[in-house]
Amino acid sequence: MKSLHFNYIAWACVATLACVVLSACSSKDSVVLPEPSQPVNPTPEVETIIPVVTIETEKHADIKDKENYINCSVVINDDGKLYTDGTPFSGTGRIRGRGNSTWTMPKKPYKIKLDSKAKLLGMSTDKEWVLLANYSDRSLLRNTTAFEISRIVGMDWTPRSRNVELYLNNTYLGVYQLTEHVKVSEERCDLDLVDEDATEDADLQADYLMELDFHFDASHQFHTSYASLPLMFKEPEQPNDAQFEYVKSCFNRAEAALYGDSFLDPEVGYSQYIDIESFLKYYIVQELTKNCDGNMRGSCYLALKSDGKVYQPFVWDFDIAFGNANHITWEQGASSTGPDGWYIKTCSPWFNRFFLDPAFVSALKQKWNILKPQFDKLPDFIQEQVNQLKFAIGRNFSSTGSGGAGWSIHGEIWPNYEDRGSYEAEVKFLKNFITARLQWLDEHINAL
């Protein structure tokens, strides 16, 4: 069933705009008035396929920063029954800003912490969620597509997400990506975390989640001894001294083996301390997307498990991947936005050593050729997402005066390479990039 939202102001103007941008839409369904109050600039008598999230902060307080939560109510309507039986979700919780560079952008991302666990739109049952704005990605599909690649590859956990339309304090903010927050839990990143008070050697041999990010702004952090990776404790966030030193020693031991003369030795080499399979999967996702945040510099997470090995548990942050950044030189002579050329292989610590291992290269070829037919279907996957978004896109990129969110499809946005002029052109670029990237990688991986 398709849902309708009604606006008494200038509905004909926006209906005409939606027709121009999205090749026409109309409806004869009955009008549904939004609750609990009429938004200032809701969509007028226009069909919606994706769910609608309505958030109201206490006393309509502004969300000013990433540190301070504000009490809020959250209502989610999936009237189109895309992910649920159509029963609305209604709950309370707290909301704050999130992100690094993305928080400085006009379209803000948010972190939500519900008062009670909830299974939102068919995803995991949890309290913590994020609303990704994807402001720099005018296709609004790069994170979604990368998560699909992660699912195909078989990462231990792929964050689930849903495209939604967001109303905040009666103002329509456009298309957002409701996504599972990065955390350790049975339904997300499933790790057996170290006990809070563990200090003995046997007890320290448990699981830890680390964040690798050049911002290096955590309370407990260190650089590794060889590659100088900036590692911060994610969970536990506040390790005791014994836990801190144990984790640091394990990473330095792994790097000593990886960068040592005997790194290929099956008994003392790097394979004793680094899980090759998980890094292989991670590599394929990051190389295929040509993600400038994927070269072990930021938005990367590593797990140290009880077996003493370092694992790649999941992937995150792809809004400027797939040729969407103009500030990275992938390699000498290669375009920063083009689909050709290695990136992770040549420009990432650790991986430049992995590729000196014939066993790693052989495993890569085998896995790539098994997965390639599924990768070839990615343009079709993207089109399916576009079909779901088609009515919402017109509202996201139309003016607030005509009922839209006011985000422009034109003009310069950091770090985009160019203004492609239309949403259709943005989608076409993404599809073409993936097709060409697959062709280049298929040829060059098999030639290794």
Where do the PLM segments sit?
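Conserved oxyanion/phosphate-binding beta-strand-loop segments in alpha/beta enzyme cores
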Residues: 72-133
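Bacterial N-terminal signal peptides that target proteins for export
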Residues: 2-13
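Bacterial Sec-dependent N-terminal signal peptides
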Residues: 19-47
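Internal "kinase-insert"/substrate-recognition segments embedded within catalytic cores
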Residues: 118-119, 133-134, 155-159, 171-284
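Hydrophobic alpha-helical membrane-insertion signals
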Residues: 40-98
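Short, solvent-exposed loop/turn and secondary-structure capping segments
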Residues: 65-67, 122-125, 142-143, 176-178, ...
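A conserved alpha-helical element in kinase catalytic cores
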Residues: 135-156
